């Protein structure tokens, strides 16, 4: 009887070799593919980071893409002024100049979504005039008492340019534009030899149940916290402090069984607004155990420790950065550091170091 392999054995061996080769290819692809989940409470800056990645790694936005942001920026600007005017009524703050009432009516007549290539001149004029009113300014100073877009002041300060007939959004305008993220969006970037698949998920509570679909084989979590919101309440539940909500969410993510081996990068974001707020809104009013007064470094250390100390796994390292997501120069530097961290983590997971 011959000792050669049967047809079935040869076919079986060929199948095994093909499976082994496919597994090798999969491992190589997995080594070069980074699946990053962007997490954080609503309005923490996740979408802004994705825009920065496009600016830094994809050459920025085309003219057509910038055009598409016009209506978003117009709507953000008009709605922000509407929110202030409505807050003035509830806070019983009068206009300094009652002749501004005409401009108030102009704002209230606008639809929720502004459409068109150009902001109507009467709307631009109304915002410019109202922004100079002391009553409006006083209400703006109390914006922690209601829900106002972070970029309101930026757009109001730039209203003459935004309302110009030849207006074209620049990088900063695009970065500061705000559209609520619903569902899950995936964005792919190539950085060196690595392919990043970045998933942005809705931060509001109602969106969180959808995160489960992103959990499998996640390489890294980028968790964002808007530290400037230490004195604000949630949009969806105005009995809950935003920073407390972020701490609760970070605790659940950091110590989740899904993420025992997943590296976590923590961006303590919106440091520019945080630094502005500290002298006028004492952090001790919201966190009674804080003893650092309005010292910026002490406040940063306090918040950093509050988050890092939630980690219950000694083997898990939390990589932290203080960030301003609208500052492209800083984000370019920070993301380069993040890339180095991820490469090391990926090599470790693949057993290469």
Swiss-Prot record:
Lipidation (N-myristoyl glycine): 2
Coiled-coil segments: none
Chain spans, region Disordered: 1-26
Domain G-alpha: 32-353
Binding-site positions, GTP: 43-48, 150, 175, 181, 203, 269-270, 272, 325
Lipidation (S-palmitoyl cysteine): 3
Region listing for G4 motif, in residue ranges: 265-272
SMART domains: G_alpha
Biased composition (Basic and acidic residues): 7-26
Sequence similarity: Belongs to the G-alpha family. G(q) subfamily.
Name the UniProt record assigns to this protein: Guanine nucleotide-binding protein subunit alpha
């Amino acid at each position: 009887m011959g000792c050669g392999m049967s047809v079935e054995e040869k076919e079986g061996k060929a199948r095994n070799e093909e499976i082994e080769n496919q597994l090798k290819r999969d491992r190589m692809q997995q080594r070069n593919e980074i699946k990053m989940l962007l997490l954080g409470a609503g309005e923490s800056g996740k979408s802004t980071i994705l825009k920065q990645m496009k600016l830094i790694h994809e050459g920025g936005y085309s003219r057509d893409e910038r055009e598409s942001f016009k209506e978003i920026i117009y709507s953000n600007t008009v709605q922000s002024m509407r929110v202030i005017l409505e807050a003035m009524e509830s806070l019983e703050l009068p206009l300094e100049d009652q002749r501004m009432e005409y401009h108030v009516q102009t704002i209230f007549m606008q639809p929720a979504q502004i459409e068109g290539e150009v902001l109507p001149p009467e709307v631009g004029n109304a915002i410019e005039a109202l922004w100079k009113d002391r009553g409006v300014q006083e209400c703006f100073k109390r914006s922690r008492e209601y829900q106002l877009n972070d970029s309101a002041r930026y757009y109001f300060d730039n209203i003459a340019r935004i309302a110009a007939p030849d207006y074209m959004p620049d990088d900063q305008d695009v970065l500061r534009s705000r559209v609520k993220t619903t569902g899950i969006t995936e964005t792919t970037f190539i950085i060196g030899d690595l392919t990043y698949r970045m998933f942005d998920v809705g931060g509001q509570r109602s969106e969180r149940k959808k995160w489960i679909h992103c959990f499998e084989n996640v390489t890294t979590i980028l968790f964002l916290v808007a530290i400037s919101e230490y004195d604000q309440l949630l949009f969806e539940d105005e009995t809950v402090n935003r920073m407390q909500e972020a701490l609760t969410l970070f605790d659940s993510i950091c110590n989740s069984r899904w993420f025992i081996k997943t590296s976590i990068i923590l961006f303590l974001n919106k440091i520019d607004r945080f630094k502005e707020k500290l002298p006028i809104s004492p952090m001790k009013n919201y966190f009674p155990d804080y003893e650092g007064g309005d010292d910026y470094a002490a406040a940063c250390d306090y918040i950093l420790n509050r988050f890092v100390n939630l980690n219950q796994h000694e083997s898990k390292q939390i990589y932290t950065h203080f960030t301003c997501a609208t500052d492209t120069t800083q984000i370019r530097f920070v993301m380069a550091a993040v890339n180095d961290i991820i490469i090391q983590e990926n090599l470790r997971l693949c057993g290469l170091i």
